[in-house]
């Protein structure tokens, strides 16, 4: 008999939660560094096929001094919903210094969390995207770690806050748990070891 069969879902009475009081306030971080977003349609060169495509929904950082961007993001399919908007997949483009065909496709992918400023102001959710940006940029200063998700770029325009991150082709752990349910012990040990490692990194850095 499986002794853990009854542990399909954790549960707690409301009184138990109430006794513990409200959640602790998040740690204070410096204000996040958010650049200005430029969204354009442009010609893109594909080095694999040598084709030139007219592409829409390209986003890059507009520098105040007028210098050209190093990279751009070709925003594509929707991956999932989030509290303030959606998460979409992107192809990273590199700048070619060619006025007629300014961008070139690379093999690198990204994910962008597109959050509506209107929803951010109206919902007043405990998960503050601006604090999330500041926290992720702060942690990224400590260097790279395979289990720490940093940001590639954080941009904004009048309508949206855009957080560009590395693309994880297998999704996230929450989605994996939703799909697979309860893990066998060896697999749970594998994931939990990573959680402990990243917790140690974050605590040590803070």
Identify the meaning behind each predicted range.
Residues 2-68, 76:
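Juxta-kinase regulatory segment immediately upstream of eukaryotic protein kinase catalytic domains
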Residues 76-83, 87:
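Protein kinase glycine-rich loop
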Residues 114-142:
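The N-lobe alphaC helix and its flanking beta3-alphaC-beta4 segment of protein kinase-like domains
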Residues 150-159:
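Short beta-strand micro-motifs within the conserved protein kinase catalytic domain, predominantly
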Residues 197-206:
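Protein kinase catalytic-loop region centered on the HRD/HxD motif
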């Amino acid at each position: 008999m499986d002794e853990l069969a009854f542990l399909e879902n954790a549960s707690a009475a409301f009184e138990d939660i109430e006794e513990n009081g409200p959640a602790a306030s998040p740690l204070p971080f410096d204000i996040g560094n958010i650049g200005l977003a430029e969204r354009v349609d442009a010609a893109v060169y594909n080095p694999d096929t040598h084709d030139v495509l007219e592409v829409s929904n390209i986003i890059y950082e507009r520098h105040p001094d007028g210098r050209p961007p190093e990279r751009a993001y070709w925003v594509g399919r929707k991956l999932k919903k989030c509290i303030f908007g959606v998460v979409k997949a992107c192809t990273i483009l590199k700048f070619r210094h060619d006025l007629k065909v300014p961008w070139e496709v690379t093999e690198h992918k990204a994910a962008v969390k597109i959050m509506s400023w209107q929803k951010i102001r109206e919902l007043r959710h405990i998960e503050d995207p601006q604090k999330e940006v500041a926290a992720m940029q702060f942690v990224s200063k400590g260097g790279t770690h395979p289990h720490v998700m940093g940001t590639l770029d954080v941009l904004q325009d009048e309508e949206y806050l855009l957080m560009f991150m590395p693309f994880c082709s297998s999704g996230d752990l929450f989605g994996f748990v939703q799909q697979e349910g309860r893990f066998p012990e060896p697999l749970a040990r594998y994931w939990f070891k990573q959680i402990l490692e990243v917790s140690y990194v974050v605590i040590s850095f803070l």
